Regions:
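His/acidic/aromatic-lined binding-pocket segments of jelly-roll/cupin-type domains
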Residues: 51-53, 60, 76, 82-85, ...
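Short beta-strand His + acidic residue motifs that chelate non-heme Fe in jelly-roll/DSBH
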Residues: 71-73, 139-144, 149-152, 219-221, ...
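An exposed, glycine/acidic-rich loop-and-rim segment of catalytic or binding clefts
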Residues: 112, 120, 131-133, 139-187
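Short acidic-glycine-tyrosine-enriched beta hairpin
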Residues: 121-133, 142, 147, 237-258
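C-terminal amphipathic alpha-helical segment
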Residues: 159-226
Length: 279
């Protein structure tokens, strides 16, 4: 079957929340808050992408991910670029992206040691609907009060530079070595290309599209290319099987997707540029 629903994994985090996104059961009072929801591929497979939801009540650690070359030199299959779609954000919520001004890795390391790295970064306000593509090497941190869908290259490789005194391992030497201590520049996002199809991100390690239409359409992925379908709101059918918000599906080959009216779908695939999808 070319469409496959992925397993949902709820991950408890002290910085998480109990009020989640529609499609997910809220956290239980008295239980640990939920910080992440992952969609796991079949055991033994090396999926190129990973989709998560994040729910934050505190600032997360300041961190960085290596690119492909540095990751492979360290024994990993790939580096990590990420994209975020902000679903909800409190009025004062921010995300740190890059440094306020060009600096040196030595200065960044000193800031990580004494905590001044917090003020070295550019904290930008975010709101629902914002899309950010954070390439490997970008020093970043997700702030409090944010609900976000994160699409990333699938590798468990994060270098924490600063964690507000929390007792977790830091990776200062490795992280500084792969950091680009420069201001963040938003990559071009093409946007609406017609037919209910918008390109949110392309030109990096993967393409992220947003779809909204009513009725059935057939898509055909090139051989060897897998897509990830994320129903943000609404639902519908994929190859006759029902899907709904709170799920994630992988798609290979030719598939018929029939969303309900006003449904909001994301579709990601690991390719540097958009490909013809619709038959």
């Amino acid at each position: 079957m070319p469409a496959h629903r992925l397993t949902t994994l709820r991950v408890e985090k002290p910085w998480g929340r109990r009020d989640l996104w529609p499609g997910f059961e809220p956290g239980v009072a008295g239980a640990a808050p939920v910080g992440e929801i992952w969609f796991d591929s079949a055991p033994g497979t090396d999926s190129q992408l990973l989709v998560k939801y994040l729910f934050t009540s505190e600032k997360l650690s300041i961190q960085v991910h290596p690119g492909d070359d540095a990751a492979r030199a360290a024994g990993y299959p790939r580096g990590k670029d990420e994209a975020w779609l902000i679903l909800a954000a409190e009025p004062e919520s921010t995300i740190a992206l890059g440094t306020r001004e060009v600096t040196t890795r030595e200065a960044l390391a000193a800031g990580a040691l004494d905590g001044s790295i917090v003020d070295m970064l550019h904290w930008r306000s975010v709101k629902a609907g914002d899309v950010i593509y954070s390439a490997a090497g970008t020093v970043h941190a997700i702030g409090a009060g944010i609900t976000v869908i994160e699409v990333q290259q699938n590798v468990d490789l994060t270098y924490r530079l600063y964690d507000y005194g929390r007792p977790r391992e830091l990776h200062l030497a490795q992280g500084i070595a792969v950091s680009d201590p420069i201001p963040f520049v938003d990559p071009l996002m093409p946007g609406d290309i017609g037919g209910g199809r918008a390109i949110l991100c392309e030109g990096g390690k993967f393409v992220l599209e947003r779809w909204s239409w009513d009725g059935a359409r057939q898509i055909a992925l090139p051989k060897g290319l897998t897509g990830w379908l994320v129903p943000v709101t609404g639902g519908g059918n994929i190859d006759g099987a029902p899907f709904t918000a709170g799920e994630c599906w992988t798609v290979d080959g030719s598939t018929v997707i029939a969303p309900r009216a006003a449904s909001d779908l994301l579709f990601a695939y690991p390719h540097p540029a958009r490909v013809p999808l619709f038959c």
